[in-house]
Amino acid sequence: MNSSYLRRPTPATLLREHQSVIGAPLDRVFAALAAAVDPGPESHFAVDPAAGMIVVQGGWWYRAEYLVTADSAGTRIQFTLLNVASPAHWAGPITGRAAIRSSAHDFGDVIEKVRLSSSASPSAG
């Protein structure tokens, strides 16, 4: 993990935002989300549990920010998709149009994984 990736680069243009609430404790949701969105070595990945922030940045234009906060119904996850291309910032949304178009569906898939993982009983041991 490189914490420098937690700072949002400039330019950064908002492309999509989605959010959902999961009825589980924040610490379990955060851990499940981090596991669900960790892209492995092909992308930059940073986690700051104290700030409730997870960042995935890959390629030259793509940046996904997840903010995890307490909610009266459990835990809220806010997803922000950004274009951080530099140079040729204008080309990010063109190159990423499929990812932008599928972001709501993809976020729903992540939420389902997190919901299943965070609602599972912690194993004894």
Regions from the language model: what does each represent?
Residues 28, 53-55, 76-78:
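General beta-strand recognition
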Residues 22-24, 62, 83-87:
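Beta-strand elements of well-folded, non-transmembrane domains
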Residues 23-27, 68-76:
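A short, structured loop/turn motif at beta-sheet edges
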Residues 1, 34, 84-125:
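A conserved amphipathic terminal alpha-helix motif
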Residues 19, 43-46, 63-70, 80-81:
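Hydrophobic/aromatic beta-strand elements that line small-molecule binding cavities or substrate pockets
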Residues 1, 47-56, 120:
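Short, hydrophobic/aromatic-rich segments at coil-to-beta transitions
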Residues 1-44:
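Hydrophobic ligand-binding cavity/cleft-lining segments
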Residues 10-12, 57-60, 71-73:
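A generic structural micro-feature
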